[in-house]
Design a protein with these regions (language model features):
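Short secondary-structure boundary/capping elements
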Residues: 66, 349, 638-642, 650
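Outer-membrane beta-barrel channels and translocator barrels
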Residues: 145, 350, 361-362, 397-405, ...
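Surface-exposed loop/interface segments of Gram-negative outer-membrane beta-barrel transport/assembly proteins
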Residues: 242-335, 373, 378-385, 391-471, ...
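Short glycine/threonine-rich loop-to-helix capping motif typified by GTGT followed
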Residues: 674-678
């Protein structure tokens, strides 16, 4: 097309290019022919229009949905194919053509699929709320993921899962339909394992999960109360086998992590940009902050790359004369440093091991799951940056008779995270890597083998902090089948959670690269001279220059002193769930289907916390309270709270075609004053 357009252009007398009217008209015609508008009508097998069918151009960006009459209109490229998808129907692909009529086929398997909802289950075909059922085998089973939260990334529409810090062992941040939080609250969804709230989705081994449902609308709050204001993630753990068999399964995976996007720092072009910006704004030379640059030093930086680029490694010591120069007022750098490479590994290993025992003997079924996760972090400079998790899960169920089934289970999770104590460093390790010019030495020692005052060095010097989270719960329950259509379920759960965090503040040391360097004096008290390659030479050598070095100092962050700190948190919680479900069918062909559910939920918690700190470490490499001689600070707290909720749900289906659902919860919390303690949560 470009060739045809250029042939229609003519050159004016002044040398300018002029496009003819014919060329312009032809170009418009080509653009108009690049897309076509396709209209169509979508029905079910009986010819009834389908509302809300998603129609997408295959391999393109155009997407529309059918209107109330099942009609759609979409603009696509000629000869495109259309992909149609709709819950309960088989996905369909057709060739795009004018005035289409498309008949979709029902997916019987999907329609009969059972989805876990609040205190019960529903056929997928009868869902009225915004519920997404996750394909666990596809999303979790085939991927080397550290936890279920990371496995849900990009899986559930309307749910965002991110790991803001990127640290191993950190909890993924899950947001459903928006980011707005309540005052002094959060906007995290309620996470439930077998109808019991758990503090973190990391406490569940992905290998122990049977199903995951995500509740996204107001119906979640109307069943689970105020805690579910931002949605609910319902996790159901694996139960025993349905047939007489005994299975032992061992799985493992070994993987390596790498940054999704390489962090590219500006090279010589960044220095050129700094110079040009200073010139354009009429600023005085030299440009830059702690490390300066002018035309002469820029030329030497270019020369340095030609001479030493690829030969001097990123972590080789910085050498005066070769890599930098001081004129008595300003420091000038020639060498570009790579703080990102010095701080971040190229690859970090990870391994997972899972053992499961599943079986059934008589009317008793059981499932036992054991898991181990070892994961290294990406911080190359740290002494330790890793995460280890142990998991154990047991579920046992036994049918006493046709009326009573009892069950018991237990869950144990131990998460241990080791990481550098960068919270006490002077310079934020990530901020300054981006903020500083690449002339600022990072990830190197000076030519005398001394540390420098910079983020990579501070991370390397920092002690290893430790965060350990332990969680244990045990549950007992029973199901009473009073009639074929009426059952009662009762579950009691006790859980215990502990958190221990150990941190320390140490004194750092390093050559001061921020400010004025000092003269390089030898052991005889004489000024040292160097040449342009950094070699020591006599003072009368041609090109010799007086040497300088970075003054070495010990320092603390934010005027603190060395210390060791410990934070300890303990929580005990008791949960009682009891609900009954009754199914009623009316009509000759049972075309009227009702389901009634009533229940109550009681949660009581008591917790205590302790924080201790002691200053003046005797041995900074071994931070312990017994090895500190300074002041001691202690604070502690204890509290309890309880929540009681009564809830109910009514479902009605007429011929499995017309559906109605209503939910209602009356919720009370001891956290509020008596006159504000109770409230209603309805949904229809």
């Amino acid at each position: 097309m470009l060739g045809l357009l250029s042939s229609a252009n003519v050159m004016a007398a002044d040398g300018s290019l002029v496009r003819s009217a014919a060329s312009t008209a032809y170009a418009l015609d080509v653009v108009q022919q690049a897309t076509v508008t396709v209209k169509g009508h979508v029905t079910d097998p009986n010819g009834e229009p389908l509302v809300g069918v998603t129609v997408t151009e295959k391999g393109g960006k155009s997407t529309v949905i059918t209107d109330i009459d099942g009609n759609f209109s979409i603009t696509v490229k000629p000869k495109s194919q259309l992909e149609l998808s709709y819950i309960g129907f088989v996905p369909t692909t057709v060739q795009a053509k004018p005035n289409m009529t498309i008949k979709m086929v029902e997916d019987g398997k999907e329609l009969n699929e059972v989805v876990v909802v609040g205190y019960g289950t529903q056929k997928k075909a009868n869902l009225t709320g915004a519920v997404t059922s996750v394909d666990v085998n596809k999303s979790l089973g085939s991927r080397p993921i550290a936890d279920a939260g990371r496995g849900l990334q990009g899986v559930v529409p309307g749910m965002n899962v991110v790991v803001p810090t990127g640290e191993v062992g950190s909890d993924p941040l899950i947001k459903i339909r928006g980011q707005v939080a309540s005052i002094n609250g959060n906007n995290n969804p309620l996470i439930l394992l077998d109808n019991v709230e758990i503090p973190s989705i990391q406490m569940v081994n992905p290998n122990d999960i049977e199903s995951i449902s995500v509740l996204k609308d107001a119906a979640a709050s109307s069943i689970y109360g105020a805690k579910a204001a931002f949605g609910v993630v319902l996790i159901t753990s694996k139960k025993g086998a349905n047939t007489e068999k005994f299975e032992v399964t061992y799985t493992n995976n070994f993987s390596f992590q790498h940054l999704a996007n390489d962090i590219k720092m500006a090279g010589l072009e960044g220095l050129r940009y700094t110079l040009d910006a200073q010139i354009n704004r009429g600023g005085a030379m030299p440009a830059g902050g702690f490390w300066r640059i002018d035309e002469d030093s820029y030329a030497k930086a270019v020369e340095w790359q030609e001479k030493y680029g690829g030969k001097v490694k990123y972590n080789d010591p910085i050498v005066y004369g070769r890599d930098w120069y001081f004129d008595g007022t300003n420091k000038f750098g020639y060498r570009l440093f790579d703080g990102v490479k010095a701080m971040i590994r190229d690859w970090a290993p990870s391994s997972q091991h899972n053992l499961s025992v599943n079986g059934k003997s008589g009317k008793t079924s059981y499932n036992i799951g054991l898991g181990l996760l070892n994961q290294d972090g990406m911080m190359r400079a740290a002494k330790h940056d890793d995460f280890r998790r142990y998991n154990a899960k047991v579920n046992v169920s036994s049918e006493i008779n046709k009326y009573v089934t009892v069950r018991a289970g237990a869950l144990y999770s131990d998460r241990n995270k080791r990481y550098p104590g960068v919270g006490t460093t002077v310079a934020d390790p990530w901020l300054y890597i981006y903020r500083w010019s690449r002339l600022m030495p990072e990830g190197v020692n000076d030519q005398f083998g001394n540390n420098l005052r910079e983020p990579v060095s501070e991370v390397a010097q920092s002690n290893t902090d430790n965060l350990q989270n332990k969680y244990f719960n045990v549950n007992l329950g029973a199901t009473f089948n009073i009639t074929k259509d009426w059952d009662v379920q009762v579950d009691y759960i006790y859980d215990h959670q502990t958190t221990d965090k150990n941190t320390s503040v140490i004194e750092y040391s390093g050559g001061q690269t921020w400010y004025t360097p000092s003269e390089w004096i030898d052991e005889n008290g004489q000024q040292v001279y160097v040449d342009a390659n950094g070699n020591q030479v006599p003072a009368d050598t041609e090109g010799a220059m007086p040497g300088f070095r970075f003054p070495y100092q010990n320092y603390y962050s934010n005027n603190t002193i060395s210390s060791v700190s410990n934070y300890s948190y303990k929580r005990n919680q008791n949960t009682l769930n009891a609900y009954t479900t009754y199914r009623l069918y009316l009509g000759k062909e049972k075309e009227h289907a009702f389901k009634f559910m009533l229940g109550m939920n009681l949660v009581s918690s008591d917790w205590s916390s302790y924080t201790g700190k002691k200053t003046d470490l005797i041995d900074p490499t071994n931070p312990q309270f017994a090895l500190a001689s300074g002041d001691q600070f202690i604070s502690a707290g204890r509290n309890w709270d309880s929540q009681l909720g009564y809830f109910g749900r009514i479902n009605y289906a007429f011929m499995d075609k017309y559906l109605f659902e209503a939910n209602l919860r009356r919720d009370g919390s001891s956290k509020f004053p008596k006159d504000l303690r109770w409230t209603w949560f309805p949904s229809f």
